[in-house]
Amino acid sequence: MKQKVVSIGDINVANDLPFVLFGGMNVLESRDLAMRICEHYVTVTQKLGIPYVFKASFDKANRSSIHSYRGPGLEEGMKIFQELKQQFGVKVITDVHEASQAQPVSEVVDVIQLPAFLARQTDLVEAMARTGAVINVKKPQFVSPGQMGNIVEKFKEAGNDQVILCDRGSNFGYDNLVVDMLGINVMVQATGGHPVIFDVTHALQCRDPFGAASGGRRAQVAELARAGMAVGLAGLFIEAHPEPNSAKCDGPSALPLDKLEPFLVQMKAIDDLVKSFPALDTSK
């Protein structure tokens, strides 16, 4: 199967190309922290020769508790993203939660993300598609890999085939996620070769059934990421924080920022190795 290439400016994303890093912080906590985290990602990825897109949310509209921090909002968030782009020359990805947000967000960032909980909302899909922007679709925890073909088809019918898919695990009983590594290629097959990336950060979530915020398994980030990279990915999605235990959202799943470089050294080594192998058809 020929692999589809989705271009984010001068960055090409495809399952058979060197992996692209989508990373940054879960939610914009402050302008200064965003600058610090983005600068570190840019420095490390340039050193290692890894294509990079900065990620952060301007509004976490789906927090479990009404008292949880959501972010600076649309207007302030776009100002921060514009400054990051000007300062570091970086591409930016962020998520939208309402159809009305799609157009103004697409005028600032390079990739707009469809959250997992909203991935089947047709009005939102159509609004995002109409922007013409590159789209990243998070696979819902409750949707099988093969069903992702239907979501991509919605985007295509609405006039946009520049779609990346992102696996972030599947429900395994209550309040737990597992990642089916076979499902990554199922998504590739179901969508006719669209790029698939792996969100290792959110795949590490493990909830307290009575808690107001997600727990996580940060200590296992490297082993889960290694497993994903061994499959052969178009990209890896990883959030980091200088003080994960103090992060305002998903700190228990965030990579300590000072571990980013050694972490990415391992990921790049695996990606280079896996993609150096010739294709091996074991279906016959």
UniProtKB/Swiss-Prot annotation:
Pathway involvement of the protein, from the record: Carbohydrate biosynthesis; 3-deoxy-D-manno-octulosonate biosynthesis; 3-deoxy-D-manno-octulosonate from D-ribulose 5-phosphate: step 2/3; Bacterial outer membrane biogenesis; lipopolysaccharide biosynthesis
InterPro entries noted in UniProt: Aldolase_TIM (IPR013785), DAHP1/KDSA (IPR006218), KDO8P_synthase (IPR006269)
EC number: 2.5.1.55
A Pfam match: DAHP_synth_1
GO biological process: keto-3-deoxy-D-manno-octulosonic acid biosynthetic process
Key words, A-Z: Cytoplasm, Lipopolysaccharide biosynthesis, Transferase
Cell compartments where the protein resides: Cytoplasm
Catalytic function, reaction form: D-arabinose 5-phosphate + phosphoenolpyruvate + H2O = 3-deoxy-alpha-D-manno-2-octulosonate-8-phosphate + phosphate
Predominant location: cytoplasm
UniProt keyword annotation of Heme present: no
Gene3D superfamilies: Aldolase class I
Domain of life: Bacteria
Coiled coil, from the record: none
GO CC terms: cytosol
GO MF, one annotated term: 3-deoxy-8-phosphooctulonate synthase activity
UniProt similarity note: Belongs to the KdsA family.
Protein name: 2-dehydro-3-deoxyphosphooctonate aldolase
Record organism: Yersinia pestis
Taxonomic lineage from the root: Bacteria, Pseudomonadati, Pseudomonadota, Gammaproteobacteria, Enterobacterales
Gene label: kdsA
